[in-house]
């Protein structure tokens, strides 16, 4: 449903392309910027879907369910951003960092989800804390680990657009799959 469609737009099928870019045609900052663009597009489309559906009366979701969809989408966007940094780690020969990222993120989000839902029985609060826990892992672990392997630079929008164009067939495949 909504939480499955929009993350595929955000990921754009780019992970495999990025880790196989052995000649470095596109720099890490270009990949990062492209993911920010695709995540922003996915969020805008999801918000639009929820809002338009609600305004036209075609929304199959209650207000609480709509909030849950958006919170879970936020969680998936953190996952999508993490993928770009995981690919940077992998290209630098540090697949161990990728494994640790998944292990820590999985344990922290599972614990936050389970404990919060058990203690509060409030799904909205549970998803909000799960999103927060995922953000903490991203900013405290994933991002600092990857920053050791690239020099941040200001990518040119034309390079980002070229990357997105080159990956468009992967994005279509990812979306349809």
Regions from the language model: what does each represent?
Residues 1-22, 76-84, 137, 174-177:
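Small-residue-rich midsections of specific transmembrane alpha-helices
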Residues 15-18, 84-91, 95, 115-119, ...:
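C-terminal transmembrane helix end/exit motif
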Residues 2-7, 38, 71-75, 86, ...:
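Alpha-helical transmembrane segments of multi-pass integral membrane proteins
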Residues 41-49, 102-122, 136-141:
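Alpha-helical transmembrane segments of multi-pass membrane transporters
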Residues 26-29, 35, 74, 88-114, ...:
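Alpha-helical transmembrane segments of multi-pass membrane transporters/permeases
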Residues 96, 100, 123-125, 140-177:
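Interhelical loop/hinge segments that connect adjacent transmembrane helices in multipass membrane
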Residues 4-54, 63, 67-73:
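Membrane-water interface segments that mark the loop-to-transmembrane alpha-helix transition
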Residues 1-7, 63-67, 123-128, 162-166, ...:
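Interfacial/gating helices of multi-pass transporter permease domains
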């Amino acid at each position: 449903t909504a939480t499955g469609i929009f993350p595929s737009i955000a990921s754009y099928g780019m992970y495999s392309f990025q880790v196989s870019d052995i000649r470095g045609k596109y720099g890490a900052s270009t990949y990062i910027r492209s993911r920010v663009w695709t995540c922003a597009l996915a969020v805008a489309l999801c918000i639009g879907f929820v809002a338009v559906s609600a305004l036209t009366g075609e929304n199959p979701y209650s207000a609480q369910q709509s909030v849950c969809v958006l919170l879970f989408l936020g969680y998936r966007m953190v996952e999508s951003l993490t993928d770009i940094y995981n690919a940077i780690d992998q290209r630098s020969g540090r697949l161990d960092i990728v494994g640790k990222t998944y292990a820590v993120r999985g344990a922290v989000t599972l614990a936050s989800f389970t404990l919060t839902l058990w203690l509060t029985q409030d799904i909205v609060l549970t998803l909000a804390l799960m999103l927060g826990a995922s953000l903490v892992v991203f900013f405290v672990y994933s991002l600092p680990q990857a920053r050791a392997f690239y020099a941040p630079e200001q990518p040119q929008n034309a390079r980002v657009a070229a990357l997105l164009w080159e990956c468009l067939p992967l994005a279509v495949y990812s979306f349809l799959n």
